[in-house]
Design a protein with these regions (language model features):
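Internal glycine-rich alpha/beta core junctions
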Residues: 1-95
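Glycine-rich cofactor/substrate-binding loops
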Residues: 48, 65-245
Length: 245
């Protein structure tokens, strides 16, 4: 009949593990999509990105300013369904008797088509969000500037030990105390992060402004990220895109 292959052993139905394997692929798509949607929702909360928002779209009937990431929320909702549907296929496969019964029939007529339909909806939403995503670099820079003083403390500590001959334990304790004080100022009074000013003013560190500025350069914390990203896009993503374009 022209089929490339056949199951070597089969009863009145093929093994329902095949259904599980098919839904496993769809579940994998849903898992990745759900992770993506969660990241977009979190970044949207931080005002670093916005998913597409139509000119006449209303985010809330009561709060006119709202721009909820409703597409990402729908991706998360549908993904949850597809991920859970995989368990349905697993239970069906495990419940087959001897040469297999037909108590799976009505179930799989629902679960398999619905999984494909839901995954199709997920991917449609996924494409819509990606194509219309707005990124706000200045907000990302603001959040980085807020947290960078804390991130830089390890570099400051190591520099002061190696280049200034400082006592590691004493420097570590000084950084801890200044970090706690700066954190309290932020959380209790809504103040700005003044950790770097505290460190600069403390003679135990012996740092100049120029030295401190060099230690908190954001590019010093990215490591191989740029190279890894470019390599991944070139070697992994581009071949797949070229295959389907």
């Amino acid at each position: 009949m022209g089929f490339p292959g056949a199951y070597p052993v089969s009863g009145q139905t093929y093994s329902r593990k095949v259904d599980f394997q098919v839904l496993q692929v769809l579940s994998g798509i849903a898992q990745s999509a759900s992770k993506f949607s969660s990241d977009i929702r979190l970044l949207s909360h931080l005002k670093e990105v916005d998913e597409p928002f139509e000119s006449g779209q209303i985010g809330s009937s009561a709060m006119a300013y709202k721009r909820n990431p409703m597409r990402s929320e729908r991706i998360a909702s549908l993904s949850r369904y597809v991920i859970c549907d995989l368990q349905n296929a697993a239970v069906t496969a495990s419940a087959q008797w001897f040469e297999r019964t037909l108590d799976d029939s009505a179930n799989r007529r629902i679960s398999i088509p619905e999984a494909f339909l839901a995954t199709d909806g997920i991917l449609t939403l996924y494409l819509n969000v990606i194509r219309g995503l707005t990124v706000y670099p200045k907000m990302a820079e603001k959040h980085l500037a807020d947290e960078l003083p804390f991130l830089a403390t390890e570099n400051i500590l190591m520099y002061c030990v190696k280049e200034k001959g400082g006592d590691r334990q004493a420097l570590h304790e000084a950084i801890r105390q200044h970090s706690v004080a700066a954190g309290k100022e932020i959380k209790l009074n809504g103040g700005r992060n003044d950790l770097l000013e505290r460190i600069l003013a403390d003679p135990i560190f012996g740092l100049t402004r120029a030295e401190l500025n060099k230690l908190v350069d954001p590019h010093a914390f990215t490591g191989m990220a740029v190279h890894q990203t470019e390599t991944f896009l070139r070697e992994q993503v581009a071949p797949v895109l070229n295959k389907y374009t």
